[in-house]
Regions:
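C-terminal regulatory/interaction regions
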Residues: 2, 304-350
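Bacterial N-terminal signal peptides that target proteins for export
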Residues: 2-16
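Core dinuclear metal-dependent hydrolase active-site scaffold
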Residues: 41, 173, 187-229
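Active-site neighborhood of phospho(di)ester-bond hydrolases with catalytic His/Asp-centered motifs
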Residues: 73-75, 98-106, 123-126, 216, ...
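Active-site HxH/HxHxD metal-binding segment of metal-dependent hydrolases
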Residues: 81, 87-194, 203, 297
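Active-site-proximal loop/helix segments of hydrolase catalytic cores
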Residues: 210-266
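Divalent-metal (often Zn2+) His-rich catalytic cores of metallo-beta-lactamase-fold enzymes
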Residues: 257-307, 311
Length: 350
């Protein structure tokens, strides 16, 4: 789940959380005439599945086509979206999906699990299984903030459409249709936890390909798994690392900094994030570590000064990081991240 502000996240969800295509020097889109996804070729038989905006897909996925089967990273935000990916993937390969990896428990990455039948192994960290099995992916302030608010978002869009000029109204009506379909799809979700769990590491050997699943420590959640292809030098990170500031509402901020340090020794050139464009190199690790340290320092100072979470969320200022994150044009952060920081500071979350 990506971060910064609730408004930006809601707009991203309404628009299908669609990321731009990777630069031509990195990859090129495959002509598949799909509606929900662009499959961006990263290397031979490795694709970044990026939403087109025609559906609310929630997150990016990764597709690894092996000798006899396919591994998909993350099942997306609803069974409708998972079905769309499965069907549209047939334009890339006739091989069956055999494995789905849940990078973490958040609804936008794991609520398509029910689409995959008994012939598909869903793999995740033991924390991820526990969270989904207990119903945590469908409750709490994170889910309430982004899914629970959908009816209100739809009502607001309809009000805007009614008062808008014809050209703008047409665009709004299209967004309304996408968001209403997404809301209906969320009502059909029956969370299915991973059928195979891991603690620290698991390796799959599929033909000549080595696929490493790694838990390097707590970060965005308590069970973030990255998928590493050492031969191809590709790393799928879920929401552990991306090109933009991530969502902190279920995070372990200080652990996250340490976990990111564990990424640095890995051999990879290309990162496939759960949100945003694919990118090259490791520089963004340092950028995100600096942001997290600054956020934590300011949150602790606000807490120790007796500032309430909502006021602190308005006052925390991360604009010094705008050189790496241009969207940081004003002070203020998502209040869920501050609430989470206060819980960690007070020992309510361990």
């Amino acid at each position: 789940m990506r971060g910064v502000t609730p408004t930006r996240i809601r707009l991203a969800l309404a628009a299908g959380t669609s990321a731009a295509l990777v630069a031509a020097s990195l990859a090129r889109p495959v002509e598949t005439q799909v509606k929900a996804f662009n499959f961006v070729r990263i290397a031979d038989d490795i694709y970044h599945a990026v939403g087109t905006g025609a559906m609310t897909v929630g997150c990016n996925g990764a597709v690894i086509v092996n000798a006899d089967d396919v591994l998909v990273v993350d099942s997306h935000i609803s069974p409708d979206v998972a079905t769309a990916l499965r069907d549209e993937l047939k334009a890339i390969t006739p091989k069956p999906i055999r494995f789905v990896v849940n990078t973490h428990f958040h609804f936008d990455h794991a609520h398509g699990n029910q689409t995959y039948g008994p012939g598909v192994e869903i793999i995740g960290h033991e924390f991820t299984r526990a969270q989904i099995a207990s119903g945590e992916s469908m409750r709490g302030r994170s889910y309430a903030s982004f899914v629970g608010t959908l009816p209100a978002q739809i009502a607001q869009m309809k009000e805007r459409a009614a008062a808008a000029p014809a050209a703008e109204r047409s665009k709004l009506e299209s967004q309304i249709d996408i968001t209403e379909r997404h809301y209906r799809a969320t009502q059909a979700v029956k969370p299915v936890p991973p059928s195979v769990t891991m603690t620290n590491a698991m390796t799959l050997y599929r033909g000549g390909r080595e696929i490493r699943l790694l838990f390097l420590g707590r970060g965005h959640t308590g069970g973030d798994v990255v998928v590493h292809l050492p031969k191809e030098r590709v790393l799928a990170t879920g929401d552990l690392l991306g090109p933009n500031p991530g969502y902190l509402g279920d995070a372990y901020m200080t652990d996250w900094v340490d976990t990111l340090e564990q990424l640095k020794p890995l051999d990879f050139d290309v990162v496939l994030p759960g949100h945003g464009d694919a990118f090259r190199g490791k520089e963004k690790i340092d950028h995100w570590q600096a942001y997290l340290r600054d956020f934590w320092t300011q949150a602790r100072q606000m807490h120790d000064a007796g500032v309430g979470a909502e006021d602190a969320a308005r006052r925390i200022d991360l604009r010094p990081h705008a050189g790496h994150y241009p969207a940081l044009t004003q002070a203020g952060v998502n209040v869920n991240g501050v609430l989470r920081a206060y819980e960690l500071i007070e020992g309510k979350i361990r």
